[in-house]
């Protein structure tokens, strides 16, 4: 059963943070690449700490071993310096898919007793 094996590693490019540069009076979009470095098919979901300002597309999916997916990370216009951005980040959560499951994302994979791993990518805003 897939849930008894801990999910393997993923890699992200960039690896430690996402940087947006001023001005912030228009929407910005950057891209991150997520690579399934493991030997199993995994399901992933993306969370953000500020859903009004930050968006990710596609927000969830499934990918096979060694497969990579390109995600668009968007930052909507906001008043830089007047809003708290210290805790802004996106979190990649991933788990093994059940053996024999179709390559279609299912939210319940994250709600059972299987292990879910997380990687936080802080957002840095340059003035």
From Swiss-Prot:
Compartments, record wording: Cell projection, Pseudopodium; Cytoplasm, Cytoskeleton
A GO cellular component annotation in the UniProt record: cytoplasm
Tissue distribution of the protein: Sperm.
Gene3D superfamilies: Immunoglobulins (2.60.40.10)
InterPro entries from the UniProt entry: Ig-like_fold, MSP_dom, Nematode_MSP, PapD-like_sf
Keyword set, alphabetical order: Acetylation, Cell projection, Cytoplasm, Cytoskeleton
Principal place of residence: other
Alphabetical GO biological process terms: oocyte maturation; positive regulation of smooth muscle contraction
N-acetylalanine: residues carrying this PTM: 2
Coiled-coil region: none
Start and end residues of each MSP domain: 9-126
Pfam families tied to this protein: Motile_Sperm
Function text: Central component in molecular interactions underlying sperm crawling. Forms an extensive filament system that extends from sperm villipoda, along the leading edge of the pseudopod.
Anything else known: Around 30 MSP isoforms may exist in C.elegans.
UniProt name for this protein: Major sperm protein 38
Protein source organism: Caenorhabditis elegans
Gene from which this protein is expressed: msp-38
């Amino acid at each position: 059963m897939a849930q008894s094996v801990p999910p393997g590693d993923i890699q992200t490019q960039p690896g430690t943070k996402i940087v947006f540069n001023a001005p912030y009076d228009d929407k910005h979009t950057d891209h991150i690449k997520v690579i399934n470095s493991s030997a199993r098919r995994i399901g992933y979901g993306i969370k953000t700490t500020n859903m009004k300002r930050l968006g990710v597309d596609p927000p969830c999916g499934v990918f096979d071993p060694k497969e990579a997916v390109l995600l668009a990370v968007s930052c909507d216009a906001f008043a830089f310096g007047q809003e708290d951005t210290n805790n802004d980040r996106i979190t990649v959560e991933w788990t093994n898919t059940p053996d024999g499951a179709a390559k279609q994302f299912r939210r319940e994979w994250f709600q059972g007793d299987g292990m879910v791993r997380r990687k936080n990518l802080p957002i840095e805003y340059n003035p």
